Structures are given as structure tokens and as C-alpha cells.
Amino acid sequence: VNRNGTLYNLSYGIISAMDLGRIEEKPVRHYRPGTKVLSVGSYGCSFRCGGCHNLDISWGTDALDALARGESRAAFVPPETLVKAAVNSGADGIAFTYSEPAVWL
């Protein structure tokens, strides 16, 4: 969102999806095969790929509109909490996925 010439990322730390799975399910499947990763996604994606199967959790236009209006009930998840969730789930790592990873910057 552009507010008076300053860009704000409304979805930083807002998780739209989270799942524990095998690294082989990710595009980096050859990195550390046999390990488990906690996959997390956030709303917002600058790509519009034909056939995207993550529209509701990546584009999330309704969710982003609610965030912009200050009407969202989505909770901010601090990095430390996300790391604890990964450790507690037995994950070997965290994969930022489901949307364009730069939304986490």
C-alpha cells in the first residue's frame, strides 16, 4: 500500500497457510532430501501466473483489502513464534512458499 509516498507491506508476518511436509514437495526438492519443512505463506503476490493453484492464499485480495482497511482479525506472527512452531513440529527448516517469497521482506 502506498501511503503518502511510503510503501507499506500490509501482510508481513500474517500467515495465510501453514503445513508440515516433505522437502520433496517443494521446488527445492533436491536440497536435503528426506527432511521435513514447515511451509508458510502470506497474502500478497506480485505475479499473476496462469493456472496458479494458490490464488486464495497468495493473492488474497479480500484479505488484503481487510488488512488495508484495518478490519482484519489476522494475527501478526513474530519470527520467534514461527521458529518455535517449526521446532515443536519437528521440522528441519522453514519454506516460505505459496506466494512470491519477497512478500516476507
Language model segments and positions:
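Conserved Radical SAM active-site core
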Residues: 4-105
